[in-house]
Structures are given as structure tokens and as C-alpha cells.
């Protein structure tokens, strides 16, 4: 976490990325925690979740997380950045997404964190397995969404992102 002293998103981007990016690189990142004394993401009213919970579950939920969720990501009056995507734009304005492995490698070179990686699954090229593998990916994503966060246990998990990479499709 970095200090909360008067900062702007532009100052943060310059601090972390000036003179560190290759020509044509664009870095996409999420800012979490506190900026200028306020949470980056406003507290969420947990009462809106009650209709979606099992009977009796809401009371336990409120005991655990409180009436409002504060998405601080372990920061106390400070912030962190997490990179989730890096692209390269060539001289013909063709944009290419870096693979996840390349994103992790560039983050290490630049000295910044990437979003937490929960799992990495390789799906076989044998198309007869695709429906079963698709189901296993969906099951894993559902499990990750419904389980407590191991990275930030003090608050709700906001969700998970499934990134698909292959030669036939752009990463998503």
C-alpha cells in the first residue's frame, strides 16, 4: 500500500509507469484502497443482498461483514494498484493483448502487482473433451465466486474473471 497523500490517478500512473513501458504499451490496472482519505470504491449497503440469501443467512452475513462492505483490500488510508491487462499497439495501430504469462512477466519487470491469479487451467486441443472441460471451468468459477476471499478475507469477494487465451481468439 502506498501513502494516501494528495494524489490523482494521473500521478499514480506516472509514478508506476513513466519511463518503464515499451513504445506502444498500454497498461490497464485497478486502483484499490483509499485515495485522498476516501475509499476508492464507495461502501456497499449489504441490505441489498438480503433477498438473495438463504433464510437466516443474512444475520450471519451481517455479523461477519457488517451493514456496509468497505472494499479496502487490506489498505489503511493508502492504496494499491493491480494490473489486469497489457496491450501493445504497433505502428499500424494494430492492438495485441499480451498473454497472461506476458502480463505477469512485465509486471515483475516494471515492479508492480498483477491481479491475484486463483487458478490456471489448460484445456486439451481434443475437441471431444471441450464440453466437460467447459463445465469444469464453470464449476471452478462458481466455486471461486461463492467461497471466501483468501487474498482479502476482511471483505466480500467482488467476483472473479475468467481469461481465455488461444490462437483463434483474443484473450478476454
Language model features: what each stretch is:
Residues 1-172:
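Core nucleotide-handling region used for phosphoryl-transfer chemistry
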Amino acid at each position: 500500500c502506498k501513502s494516501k497523500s494528495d494524489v490523482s490517478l494521473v500521478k499514480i500512473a506516472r509514478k508506476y509507469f513513466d519511463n518503464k513501458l515499451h513504445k506502444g504499451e498500454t497498461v490497464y490496472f485497478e486502483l484499490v484502497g483509499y485515495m485522498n482519505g476516501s475509499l476508492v470504491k464507495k461502501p456497499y449497503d449489504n441490505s441489498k443482498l438480503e433477498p438473495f440469501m438463504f433464510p437466516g443467512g443474512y444475520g450471519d452475513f451481517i455479523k461477519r461483514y457488517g451493514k456496509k462492505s468497505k472494499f479496502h483490500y487490506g489498505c489503511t488510508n493508502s492504496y494499491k494498484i493491480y494490473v489486469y491487462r497489457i496491450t501493445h499497439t504497433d505502428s499500424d495501430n494494430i492492438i495485441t493483448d499480451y498473454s497472461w504469462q506476458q502480463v505477469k512477466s512485465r509486471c515483475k519487470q516494471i515492479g508492480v502487482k498483477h491481479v491475484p491469479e486463483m487458478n490456471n487451467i489448460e484445456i486439451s486441443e481434443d475437441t471431444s473433451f471441450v464440453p466437460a472441460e467447459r463445465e469444469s471451468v464453470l464449476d471452478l468459477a462458481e466455486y471461486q465466486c461463492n467461497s471466501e476471499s483468501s487474498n482479502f478475507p476482511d471483505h466480500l469477494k467482488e467476483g472473479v474473471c475468467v481469461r481465455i487465451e488461444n490462437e483463434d481468439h483474443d484473450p478476454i
